[in-house]
Amino acid sequence: FETETADLVILDAPPQDDGTWKNLAENELLAAAAQRAGLDTESTVTALPVGQSLYAYWADNRVLTELLQSDAALDDLRAATWEEWFDFVTAVTHWCAEPGAVQVTLNGNAYTLPAERRETLANLNGVFAAQGPEVSGNSGDGGVAENTPALYTTALLAAGEPLTEENLTGPLNALEQELRLEDANSAWQAGIADLWTSKYLFQQGNALFYRGYLADLISDSGAALSSAQKDALVWLPIKNNLTEADIANQRFNLAGLMNYPILANRAWLAIPADADEESARAAAAAVLWLYTSKAGESALIDTLDLITPWGTGSNQNAAAAMQAAQVTAGILPGAALDKTQAAALQQAQRGLYYEADGITLRDGLWDEDAAAAWRSAVMAALGAESAEADDN
């Protein structure tokens, strides 16, 4: 995504109503566009969504099938318990270092890793390629890592509303365990991977799983996947170490939060409050072109591989068609965070990877003090209510 077109700015999360951005609901045509996107135009609308993309772990099904020596493994891997997932990831890391026939259990069914490294698995040297809390070259607002809001979705859905420290503690602990698992089993051991590095690791076959948006992965920006790789993409849910006791939200159960991909907004469009009349008119015209014309819709679904804010998708390639079908089959709704919250979450997450000076990378996994500081910072970023506040 480019930073801006005229005075139309592309952001990774909607900004707060602080006077910096135009209220799009004040323009009759933009208000209609906002309503088409499902936004409340009785309130201030600082940005309109560009579109949504599935957020998950992504695998090349040819590699996955070769590794687990079965065409039936995908469904069992999706339905695996946390314990099975943890053991599988650990086993694959050991296998990468020293290939050998090792049995793993997924959804109660046994699979055996191959006794030797075959051609399809020649470059595999780790399990995960995942963007850390850093900004890549395509971050439109230059400040928030692309995956930050989506990463916290499962924890927020488990905690429910109103958001309290008590309800959020268990889900955050569950997310931390998944982040620890990723870090300990990463295909990248030279610091924190950004979006481009993660995508390159997956494209080269170094990593079994890529965590991120499908739209980013199949984009030709950066390390472009081959047509065969794109056609072979399959999703895996991001499995936080949740238990039933961690779920305060009665709308979701453990299987629902553990076994489905997330559908999250990929970017937002906003117009600066100080844009002159001509620039603001041009920016509004660009938004309306996307929202109301066939060519604009095609740009969203066929070029950017997004699901439109009004729910349409593309079937022009296998990956986009799979995404559109999955929206109907079942997804988790992405977290609704504003830009300030997303930036604060990113900063909180950096504390897991950097020492207190914010510059020096930690040598190995973070300690409990860093984890406690992260949880506190996340609570503050999200405005979680404390028990003391509830008592007053």
Language-model features: where?
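Extracytoplasmic/periplasmic substrate-recognition and gating elements
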Residues: 225-313
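Short helices/loops that flank or line small-molecule/ion binding pockets
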Residues: 1-9, 86-94, 183, 194-210, ...
